[in-house]
Amino acid sequence: MRLRNNANAPLYLKSQEQYIVNDQQLLKNDLAKVFKNPHLPLHIEIGMGKGDFIVENALHNPQINYLGIEKFPTVIVKAHKKALKHKLDNLAMICFDANAILDLLNSKSIDKIYLNFSDPWPKKRHAKKRLTNPYFLEKFAALLKDDGLIEFKTDNESLFHYTIYDVLLNDLTKYEILFLTYNLYALVNNVELLKNIPTEYEKKFVMQGQRIKKVSFRFLKKND
C-alpha cells in the first residue's frame, strides 16, 4: 500500500535537529556536526524507506556511521520516528534526490552503499532511472573509497537480471561480483543470511514466499 502523503512532512523535518540533516553542506564540510565520531567508516542507504534497515544497522554496528537518503518527506518522517526510539550517535537522515548525490557527498568518502528494493522502473525507456544503471553507478563509483562496496537486494527478477547480465557482467573491466544469490533465505547458516538485516519490504516479501536476490560488488581500479 502506498503511503498517504503528509503535507506537513517538510515542515516537520525542518523542525528536527536529532538525526535529520537540514543543511546538506554539513555532509561535505563538517561531519562533526552530523556524527559524534566523524572519522568512523560511512555507510549510506539510498532510498531508505521507513528506516527499518538503517536504524537496525546503526543499533548493531556502533563502529560505523550510517546515512539514510530518501527523497520523499512523508516516508522519511516514518523513519525518523523509529530512530527517535533509540539513542544513536552514528545515524543521520536527509531528504534528498539521489540524482544529485554528487552535490551531497565528497568523492572517495563512502565505504559502502546499500540499494534495497529500489524502484525497478520496468519500462525499457526508463532504464536510466534504475539505481543499478551505469548512469548511477558512475556517480556511486566517484563517492566510494577504493575498497568500497555496493550491496543490492531486490525481490524483482527482471531488475536483478538486468543488474547482473546487462550491467555487471557486461563489462568485466569495471565490476567485480563478490557475492551473488537468487535466494538469500535459502542459505541456511550462511554468514550472508546470518548477518542480514531485513527492510520493511523484505519482511513482507519473505512472508509471501518471494525469493530475495542479493549481489555485492565493487568497482575495479585500473591496476586490478
Curated annotation (Swiss-Prot):
The UniProt record gives the binding positions of substrate as K123, D155, T199, E200, Y201, E202
E.C. designation(s) = 2.1.1.33
List the GO terms this entry assigns under cellular component, sorted alphabetically: tRNA methyltransferase complex
Q: Which reaction does it catalyse?
A: guanosine(46) in tRNA + S-adenosyl-L-methionine = N(7)-methylguanosine(46) in tRNA + S-adenosyl-L-homocysteine
- List the pathway annotation: tRNA modification; N(7)-methylguanine-tRNA biosynthesis
What top-level branch of life does the organism fall under?
A: Bacteria
Enzyme class comes to: transferase
Family annotation (HAMAP family): tRNA_methyltr_TrmB
Protein name in the entry:
tRNA (guanine-N(7)-)-methyltransferase
UniProt keywords (A-Z) are: Methyltransferase, S-adenosyl-L-methionine, Transferase, tRNA processing
Report whether Lipid biosynthesis shows up as a keyword of the record. Answer: no
Function, in words: Catalyzes the formation of N(7)-methylguanine at position 46 (m7G46) in tRNA.
GO MF? tRNA (guanine(46)-N7)-methyltransferase activity
Entry's family note: Belongs to the class I-like SAM-binding methyltransferase superfamily. TrmB family.
Please tell me where S-adenosyl-L-methionine binds in this chain: E45, E70, D97, D119
- Organism of origin is Ureaplasma urealyticum serovar 10 (strain ATCC 33699 / Western)
Where are the catalytic residues?
A: D119
